Each structure stands twice: as C-alpha cells, then as structure tokens.
C-alpha cells in the first residue's frame, strides 16, 4: 500500500505505523544513492519552500544535516539558535508557533520538553520535526536503522544491544526503532534504569514486538548481552545541558557498561558499533580532559578520557558512527520530502 506522509509531523515515532517507518528508512537509502549519482543537482522539488530549524540545544550534526538536506531539495533554511528566539521566555510557544507557521512550510525543533514539540505541532499548522527532546530522538533513529539496513539488509530478527544510559532519549528511541523492525533488543545497564522508562512507551513497544516479531529484554551483564549481537550501540553518559557535576554519579553507575573489545569479541564477527556522537573515546576534548583529571584517580576506567567506549573500539573497523552521522542528512532529507514535498 502506498505511503503518504504529506502534512504529517514527526513528533514521535510512536505516532507512525510500521509501514510508514519502513518507508522513511527505504526512502533515505534511495535518496542517498541519488545523491551519490549526482541526481539531486537537477531535481529540487522543494524550490519555493522554506523551513525553520529552531534550536534550544546546539548540535553540529542535526543543524548541518537539515541545512544540507533542505539545500539539496531546493528549500530555503532559517536557523534560529538558543539566543535567537524568545520562545517560552517573552513569547509563548503557542504564539511563536503561530508566527513561524505563517512564514515557513515546516519547522524543526531541537530542545528539552516534548510538550514544546506538541505545542508547535498543535499551533503552527505546518509539519514539525522533532530534532531531539528529553523523551525521544526520532530523526536520529531513522538514520540509525538506515545504517543498519545498509549493512545487513532485512533487519528482522537481528540483535541489537543498547548499553549504558538506556533510559535516555536515544536508548528509548532505539527500543522503539527495534520494535518497528522486528529486532531483538537488549537494554544493558543498571537494573533500576528500566524503572525510569515511561510505562506507556514500554507498553506500546511490547505491543509492536508482538505484531512485528523480535523481543525486548534487560541485562546487567555486558558480555552476556553482547553474545551473538549484530549491533552494539551506546551514547554519552551525561547529555548536553546536564551539569558537569553529574559525571561523578553517572560514571559510578555506568563504569561497568563501557563498550570495549571484550564486548566486541563476544558479539558476531561482523558486529557494528554505533554512536550518535559526539563520543568520549579519548582525551582530545576539554570535557574529557577535565573528567580524566578530576575523576581519573577515583574511576581508572576514565583516566585516559575514555568513557562510554574505548578508543580501541572507536578506531576499529567495527565503528560505523561516521556512516551513521552522514546518514542523518539523507534520512532528514527523506523526512522533509515526505512531509512537505509529495
């Protein structure tokens, strides 16, 4: 059955069907092939369209992906950064949404509260794309599962391990994506983290697993979790916007859940490693140096600036994080085109 997403918002993946999610993944792959063949140069279906990308949280990949994707499609882009809008401060989100909806054909929002995305959807009158909230990261997940499909083809019954802070937006979104693709997902980290996953989201995922196949389980043993895994995925232990003081607590909780070569060796020979980036895998950033200096003696695991993944894994051929990063652009192009183009 043909999929028509024109006029739809990507506020949450859970508002989409399995067929619609699969369509976005497949279209992303097709658009990537077209880009590599140079076919986008004379095919700009969104000439005359304009989009706004509204950021409460800065991001290299999300901003660049939206700007390049829109440019390839022929659309104009306005970037509104954290200091460029009074939304929620001097002007209500409702009023901001109504104004932006008069100017633009679509709005990307990257920030904190899912309720802000919901308000933009409700009041703007145009498609809204969730570039990240505290609850979910749907544009990232389309790119992630695109990357997996490029590697493995059919994802049904493939095994993915999300290790570390699996209760965060990327961990929860990975669980949702696995449910749409009939995969077996293991959420590996502290046992009490599972109690922090929204019960409604969990219930919807379980229903999707029943319908699409695959399974969900939780583990506190990273080697057992990694056995026969096709994909190992992790994210930072402290997210952008959270205080530096939180590193001590999180490292204490997650020190046994670092992705290392022991995990890789426990998985399948062709296992791929994914990370939405940026990653703390060495001491080449001011943050990782500060963590190593401040907490390296207390937690030797971070003494070299490595946190959620070792540099050995990150520099290995298993690492597909940069393919994944590139695919942000192709998948976002698919999302924009599907919702304001066709």
From Swiss-Prot:
GO terms for molecular function: amino acid binding; ornithine carbamoyltransferase activity. Pathway: Amino-acid degradation; L-arginine degradation via ADI pathway; carbamoyl phosphate from L-arginine: step 2/2. It is found in: Cytoplasm. It comes from the Bacteria. InterPro entries: Asp/Orn_carbamoyltranf_P-bd, Asp/Orn_carbamoylTrfase, Asp/Orn_carbamoylTrfase_sf, Asp_carbamoyltransf_Asp/Orn-bd, Orn/put_carbamltrans, OTCase_ArgI. Carbamoyl phosphate binds at residues 59-62, 83, 110, 137-140, 276-277, 328. Its EC number is 2.1.3.3. It catalyses: carbamoyl phosphate + L-ornithine = L-citrulline + phosphate + H(+). One of its GO terms (cellular component) is cytoplasm. L-ornithine binds at residues 169, 235, 239-240. Coiled coil: none annotated. The keyword Cytoplasm applies. Keywords: Arginine metabolism, Cytoplasm, Transferase. One of its GO terms (biological process) is arginine biosynthetic process via ornithine. Dodecamer (tetramer of trimers). nvolved in the catabolism of arginine. Catalyzes the phosphorolysis of citrulline, the reverse reaction of the biosynthetic one, yielding ornithine and carbamoyl phosphate which serve to generate ATP from ADP. Belongs to the aspartate/ornithine carbamoyltransferase superfamily. OTCase family. This is Ornithine carbamoyltransferase, catabolic. It comes from Malacoplasma penetrans (strain HF-2) (Mycoplasma penetrans). The gene is arcB.
């Amino acid at each position: 059955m043909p999929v028509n997403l024109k006029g739809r918002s990507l506020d949450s993946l859970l508002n989409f069907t399995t067929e619609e999610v699969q369509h976005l993944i497949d279209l992303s792959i097709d658009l990537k092939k077209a880009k590599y063949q140079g076919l986008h140069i004379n095919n700009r279906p969104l000439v005359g369209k304009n989009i706004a990308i509204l950021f409460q949280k800065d991001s290299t990949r999300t901003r660049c992906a939206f700007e390049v994707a829109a440019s390839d499609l022929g659309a104009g882009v306005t970037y509104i950064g954290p200091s460029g809008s009074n939304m929620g401060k001097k002007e209500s989100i409702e009023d901001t949404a109504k104004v932006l909806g008069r100017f633009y054909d679509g709005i990307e929002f990257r920030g904190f509260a899912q309720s802000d995305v919901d308000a933009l959807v409700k009041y703007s009158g145009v498609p809204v794309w969730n570039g990240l909230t505290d609850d979910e990261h749907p544009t990232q997940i389309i790119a992630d599962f695109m990357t997996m499909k490029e590697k493995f083809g059919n994802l049904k019954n493939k095994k993915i391990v999300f290790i570390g802070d699996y209760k965060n937006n990327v961990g929860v979104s990975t669980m949702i994506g696995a449910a749409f693709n009939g995969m077996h997902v293991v959420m590996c980290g502290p046992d009490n983290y599972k109690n922090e996953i929204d019960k409604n989201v969990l219930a919807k995922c379980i229903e999707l697993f029943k319908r699409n196949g695959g399974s969900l389980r939780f583990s506190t043993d990273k080697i057992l979790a990694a056995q026969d895994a096709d994909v190992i995925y992790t994210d930072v232990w402290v997210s952008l916007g959270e205080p530096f003081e939180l590193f001590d607590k999180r490292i204490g909780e997650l020190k046994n859940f670092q992705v290392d070569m022991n995990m890789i060796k426990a998985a399948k020979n062709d296992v791929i490693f994914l990370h939405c980036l940026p990653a703390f895998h060495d001491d080449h950033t001011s943050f990782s140096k500060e963590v190593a200096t401040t907490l390296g003696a207390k937690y030797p695991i971070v003494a070299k600036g490595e946190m959620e993944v070792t540099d050995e894994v990150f520099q290995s051929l298993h690492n597909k994080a940069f393919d994944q990063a590139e695919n942000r652009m192709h998948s976002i192009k698919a999302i924009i085109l599907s919702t304001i183009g066709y």
